[in-house]
């Protein structure tokens, strides 16, 4: 809502698209969720374009890439960004868009393997086949040959689920068009390529499904690909990639629980708000992780909500003595003691003195 922040710009906001936005990227610890690096930049810059600068800034800040693997989703994927990570000697696991011709050809070539039970893993519940790619690392002293792993995956029944959902959405569009009703703009933009207008022999015009377009869109349904220089085993690579759900939990905490989704402040104050919200998110994530690690028996986070836990702790009270400069803690219930233990905290002292 700010009219003074210079870096806000109109981007691709799904919520309140009439408002300009500021992009804010997190890099979080895979285990604890603690935010280890954050970068804010103009809202009109897409993730894939900003990725290179983010990695360079992490390098300049002294981030030690030798001890970590950078896991990113398809939103950051491009051949240029892959090359930057190779040149900077970053270990990475990168989700890949299926729009690359080399990826499509690989799926076509190894389609039989992706239907062979020998290539199936019951733990990850996925078929996988791996191939290698030859890349170059460009240094000040010339180029070096590098080998990357391209992992191809097929998720059983996912292609049928995608087909069913696509057919359902297309049918809804057809029903509206043939009833001369308006299709919601976003829905029409997404599905208009799957319908076409036809004419009967009597000259009657009607809307019909374009099966060729649907078949082309579903050709690689249920497929996924990863490119990496860090893990040769496709199932281990996918297991690591799936852990990036921690990032989504971070953003959920930032946007929905610490008031980080709206900047109701000026150009001189928004950096402070971003810092405070980032610290608050890290503290909440560390509390959630620590509490889950300490769960045992009946001692669990109530309703799996850290806010319910905090509410129970807020009920701990102390009364001031009338005859002394001290506070006396009221009796602490077993439930409150359990919540303190989940956070790794000791029970407060019986008497608190100024």
PLM segments and residue spans:
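Anion-binding and metal-coordination hotspots
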Residues: 1-354
């Amino acid at each position: 809502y700010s009219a003074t922040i210079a870096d806000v710009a109109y981007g691709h906001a799904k919520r309140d698209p009439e408002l300009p936005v500021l992009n804010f990227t997190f890099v979080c610890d895979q285990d604890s969720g603690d935010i280890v690096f954050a970068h804010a930049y103009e809202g009109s810059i897409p993730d894939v374009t900003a990725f290179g600068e983010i990695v360079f800034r992490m390098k300049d800040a002294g981030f030690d890439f030798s001890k970590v693997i950078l896991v990113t989703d398809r939103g950051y994927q491009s051949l240029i960004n892959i090359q930057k990570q190779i040149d900077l000697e970053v270990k990475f696991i990168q989700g890949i868009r299926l729009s690359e011709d080399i990826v499509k050809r690989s799926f076509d070539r190894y389609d039989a393997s992706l239907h062979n039970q020998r290539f199936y893993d019951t733990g990850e519940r996925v078929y996988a086949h791996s191939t290698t790619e030859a890349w170059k690392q460009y240094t000040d002293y010339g180029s070096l040959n590098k080998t990357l792993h391209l992992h191809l995956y097929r998720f059983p029944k996912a292609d049928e689920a995608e087909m069913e959902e696509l057919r359902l959405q297309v049918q809804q569009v057809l029903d509206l068009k043939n009833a001369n009703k308006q299709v919601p703009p976003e829905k029409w933009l997404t599905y208009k390529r799957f319908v076409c207008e036809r004419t009967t022999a009597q000259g009657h015009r009607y809307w019909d499904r374009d099966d060729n377009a649907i078949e082309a869109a579903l050709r690689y349904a249920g497929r996924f690909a990863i490119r990496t220089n860090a893990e040769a085993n496709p199932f281990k690579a996918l297991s690591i990639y799936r852990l990036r759900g921690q990032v989504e939990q971070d953003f959920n905490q930032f946007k929905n629980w610490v008031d980080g989704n709206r900047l109701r402040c000026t150009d001189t104050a928004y950096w402070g708000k971003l810092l405070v919200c980032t610290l608050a998110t890290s503290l909440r994530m560390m509390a959630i992780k620590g509490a889950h690690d300490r769960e045992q028996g009946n001692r669990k986070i109530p309703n799996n909500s850290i806010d319910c836990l905090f509410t129970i702790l807020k009920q701990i009270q102390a009364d001031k003595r009338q005859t002394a400069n001290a506070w006396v803690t009221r009796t602490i219930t077993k439930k409150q003691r359990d919540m303190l233990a989940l956070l790794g905290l000791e029970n407060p002292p019986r008497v608190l003195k100024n």
